């Protein structure tokens, strides 16, 4: 949670209110850990970044034109420690999602990001993700999300 506490003020300073006091919370990360879907990047003994690499697809993903019954690997809760931003941590975590997809026998990778998150909107296309559409999520009212997909 220390990483979230460092990242959230930076997100808010850029107008990105995707994360806040209520999300993500310790219970969310505890569930990720229990399901063996939380990935941690470590540099010099410090947590450099985290992501949840899952098969969880929100029902609203269908609004982006996706068949949510297809097996896909989905990245959620991607965060990079400010001390390690610009060092390829997010790229490495996204590449880990590709490894998980290959092991799971799927070639579909998906991710969504807040419409105000300019950093990830720049990152995902550089990694081969294609913009698929804009959605809203019932669990995050008042926010808009951009969906991206990559086929291996």
Region roles according to the model:
Residues 94, 101-113:
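Conserved GNAT acetyl-CoA-binding A-motif
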Residues 80, 86-99, 122-126:
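Conserved acetyl-CoA-binding loop-helix of GNAT-fold acetyltransferases
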Residues 8-31:
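Conserved GNAT-fold acetyl-CoA-binding loop/helix
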Residues 37-51:
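Conserved beta-hairpin
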Residues 91, 103, 116-133:
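Conserved active-site alpha-helix within GNAT-family acetyltransferase domains
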Residues 112-113, 125-145:
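Conserved catalytic-core motifs of GNAT/GCN5-like acyltransferases
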Residues 52-77, 85, 139:
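Conserved acyl-donor/pantetheine-binding loop and adjacent beta-alpha core of acyl/acetyltransferases
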Residues 28-40, 56-57, 74:
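A short helix-loop-beta-strand connector motif used in the catalytic cores of GNAT acetyltransferases and
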